[in-house]
Amino acid sequence: MTFENTLHFAQQLDRNDPLRSFRDRFLIPQAGGKELIYFCGNSLGLQPKAAREALDRELTVWQHLAVEGWFMRPDQAEDTPWLSIHKRCKDPLAQIVGALPSEVVPMNNLTVNMHLMLTSFYRPAGQRTKILTIGGDFPSDQYALETHIQARGMNPADVLVEIFPREGESAWRGEDICNAIDTHRDTLALVLMSGLHYYTGQVFDMAAIARKALQAGVPVGFDLAHAIGNIPLWLHDWQVDFAFWCSYKYLNSGPGGVSGVFIHQKHHNANLPRLAGWWGYDEDSRFAMTKGFVPMAGADGWQLSTPTVLAMAVHHAALQITAEAGMDALRRKSEQLTAYLEFVLRNSGYPLEIMTPADPAGRGCQLSLLVHQDGKRLFNRLVEQGIIGDWREPDCIRLAPTPLYNTFEEVWHVGQILLKFRT
């Protein structure tokens, strides 16, 4: 498509958008009675209108049934009781990440789940002790890896194999990651990295990485914090061993919302080491309170504690929206929306560098802009104009037009404001 930098063109794209009605399902932040241009779904997604209703339903159950809410619903409501509330989320989660329902479960928060997955899938033996990852991954992932390795009595410097972009480049080359797996195949115990980089916005070729790890006989896992709800995933078909994510970005499940994990079906009958808790115990006999852990089938057996019912209710309401829109349709709009943002940014003539890969297949909805002079000042001026993005030190502005609720007209306005700043 040939883009035009005009309001009429942007509005025409919006009129032709098959997902345009989904914006009405979200509460758009306002200032001075005017809707803000919110390009920060990569940090915190907007509140679905259905969230409050979902919360109210569970508060009503708590009000009228109290502890019995774990086992029944008022007036035979269709929703499952709290005892099985996580099951409400399994079908939409499976659809979004390309998995079987038995392979996914919502639980905990991301870094907790990362430690749980490391416990099960990092099994150093003999000379196979190393973990291959990318250098400069999200800090919480770095801290989790370092401290988990230390807790095993090992030195992170001896264990971690970090892959960086080449000198003078901001993006990783897929062949460098795959070649590193080949190079270290005899000493690797695990490959673990983000599926989409938080800072650059780069999408990694998870299918190729998983394929190479499988050939090397090394388990592979991905942090999908910035990938889930952003790009289509086929974790089961890719033979990914495990994955984990948060839900408060593109899934719009609220600040600190419920995380989740994927564990491939091939591991469900394996006697993997795990940290267990009573909510992962076989639900048919959980309340017998007997000694000895008997896990639930599938990923459910990795649950630890009683679920956070109110957060889970919002999570389910938000997941239904994403599942209804469909990841293929969301991706089609996202590619066009982000390409149009790139177009208007370049047309503005503002002195900035887009560090996110130009290839649509190599990025999600986020563009990371390097502003080498007065970047923080530009960011603050954008906020003053009602444009909400995200600032990352030392000189990066992240803008993420999100297909569920952002418009092409909003993108056009961002370009016009930058044009005004330049002149």
Model-derived features: where do they sit?
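Pyridoxal 5′-phosphate
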Residues: M1-T423
